[in-house]
Every structure is written in C-alpha cells, then in structure tokens.
From Swiss-Prot:
Cell membrane keyword on record: no
GO biological process: isopentenyl diphosphate biosynthetic process, methylerythritol 4-phosphate pathway; terpenoid biosynthetic process
Superkingdom in the source lineage: Bacteria
InterPro entries the UniProt entry points to: Dihydropteroate_synth-like_sf (IPR011005), IspG_bac (IPR016425), IspG_bac-typ (IPR004588), NO2/SO3_Rdtase_4Fe4S_sf (IPR045854)
Taxonomy of the source species: Bacteria, Bacillati, Bacillota, Bacillota incertae sedis, Caldicellulosiruptorales
NCBIfam families reported in the protein's UniProt record: ispG_gcpE (TIGR00612), PRK00366.1 (NF001540)
Pathway, per record: Isoprenoid biosynthesis; isopentenyl diphosphate biosynthesis via DXP pathway; isopentenyl diphosphate from 1-deoxy-D-xylulose 5-phosphate: step 5/6
Functional note: Converts 2C-methyl-D-erythritol 2,4-cyclodiphosphate (ME-2,4cPP) into 1-hydroxy-2-methyl-2-(E)-butenyl 4-diphosphate.
Entry similarity comment: Belongs to the IspG family.
Binding site for [4Fe-4S] cluster: 259, 262, 294, 301
Keywords annotated in UniProt: 4Fe-4S, Iron, Iron-sulfur, Isoprene biosynthesis, Metal-binding, Oxidoreductase
Name under which the protein is recorded: 4-hydroxy-3-methylbut-2-en-1-yl diphosphate synthase (flavodoxin)
Catalytic activity as recorded in UniProt: (2E)-4-hydroxy-3-methylbut-2-enyl diphosphate + oxidized [flavodoxin] + H2O + 2 H(+) = 2-C-methyl-D-erythritol 2,4-cyclic diphosphate + reduced [flavodoxin]
EC number(s) recorded for this UniProt protein: 1.17.7.3
Amino acid sequence: MTKKIKIGNLYIGGGEPIRIQSMTNTKTKDIEKTVEQILRLESLGCEIIRVAVPDMESAKAIEKIKAKIHIPIVADIHFDYKLALEAIYNGADKIRINPGNIGGPEKVKKIVDEAKRYGIPIRVGANSGSLPKEILEKYKSPTPEAIVEAALNQVRLLESFDFDNIVISVKSSDILTTIKSYEILSRRTSYPLHVGLTEAGTFIAGCVKSSIAIGHLLLQGIGDTIRVSLTDDPEKEVTVAKEILKGLKLKKGVNIISCPTCARCNVDLIKIANEVEKRIGNLDLDISVAIMGCAVNGPGEAKEADIGIACGIGEGLLFKKGKIVKKVKEDDLVDELIREIYSLYKT
C-alpha cells in the first residue's frame, strides 16, 4: 500500500479512492474562463485540477481561482523556480516540477523549503521524451528502466532535503513502456503514483491507449490518481477516466448497456442511448441500465440489468431484472425510464 498524503481537502494513497485528475487548457491568467472550465470539470467528477503556470501573472491568479472552485489545484511548473514559490504563496495545493529543468539543486531546495512550510506535496517524475542526457547515454533509449531511474533520481534529490511529501509519475506515449515503467516503480517505492499515458493523442486513439494502460495498471493495484490525457476538451478526459474506474468496479456510477443495433431495430437507438446517458450518466448510483433495440436483446439478453427498455414498433417494454413491468409508448420510453431510475436513486 502506498503512503497516504493530503492534497488540499482530500487524501490520496494509503487505500483512499483513486482520484480523477485533469488539466485546464485555458490561459491560467484568464481567471474567469479558467474557473468556468474547472467548475464544469468538477460537475463531471474531476477531483484534482492542474493548471499550467508559465508566468507570474498565472501564478498570482491561483489565489482567485482557488477561491471559486471546490477541488485541489496543482501548479504545473517548468524552468523558473520563482513561479513555484509564487504559486505556493498564492495557495497551490500541490506543485508539479521537473527538478532537471528548474536550475539546479539549490533552486529545487528553495521550492522544497516552502512546500514544507506550507505543508503541500510535490509531484516529480519522468517522461520518456525528456530524459536527462546521462540517463539516455546509459540506457541508449527511453526504456522503462531508464524512465524509472530518472524519476527516482528526482525523488532522492527531494529526500536529500528531508522532504517526503511526494507523488511520482513515470509516463510515456507508448502503452507497453508506460505499463512496464509503473510496474517497476511500484516495486521500488511506496510513494503515491499518478498514472497516465502522456501525449496519448486525439479522442479515439487517446481513449483506447489510455484505457489499456491505466486499466492494466489499476487491475494490479497500481495507481492513486489518474489522468486520461487527450488532445480534446478536458471534459472528455474526466468522462473517460470515470468510465475506466466504473468499468473496473472502482467507482460507483450508472453502467449503460446498449446493443449495437441491426435490421430488427425500428427506432433511432443511438439517439435514445445518448439521451439516456446524457441525463443520468453523472448519477452516483450503482446500477446497470439496458437500452435495447428489439425484444431479442431485451429483456432476455439484458436480464442482468437492474432496469431497461426494449424498443419495438410504436411502443416498447420497460423491464426490471429481466421481468417486464409495463408497455410504454415509444415517445414516452425515455422519460418513463428516467422516472423509474430516479425513483431508484431516491431510495
């Protein structure tokens, strides 16, 4: 079990729930837009938010942003240690740094000293695309062993300053390299691990690659926070991350079962399924909901679902646990299903 540490108003590691993290893509100094985006991400289930801090104006904006949101905020720092200090002074709940590009151990120590004084953790780690020259010379390529060694070198630097409030990540854009790196790291440290596939790509490719890597690691008990990194709206990152956790039974949530449709289907099931998902997808209710295009798939094949509908011609069946409850007109099917789900939710 990893060490438990506190980030803002929540804990990670040590048996705590796996936390969903994302990162804003607004200009951090644009406080209004950044807050708006974070609040949307919160509503979808984001539990930790990271913001880039490229300049002093962004670092100073953290105070006003934090005052309007409800989840811990992480400052992402590169190159200038003074940005980290300013972010800490303005209320950052956690700092993410790469000690190798901050400007030497003495500057890292200044960050560590303030992080200790304010009681906030630091995330360090290695990415396959930015390994130190000496590591690449030793291993010839960004192997998992190289990535882990680079990350642990950063950890040892922080530990040399008597600091152990640490989170580690070891990311690659390659699925197998990412998995192997975290497997090695998890055997060599008890610090909490932030898991993700870096630069995973556009929506479909990124979802697939991240789901494979993150899911594989979580099944082994590796990972305390996760981020699905996508070249897309951060809201999609949170939704996909939540689906990964729900799929592995690591988080409560509605599980929607729906058939792929065929010639027997006489309704626009894709539209119906998407509407149901939109209306109930964020409920913290541990049930399975089936949306089937014909009587073949439901309620028979979907009898394991807690509740569902099977569409016909002009009408459909509402069923619970495989037993038909009532016939419903086609136009009323979705609303009736939602009403029944909310009645379950209230109980």
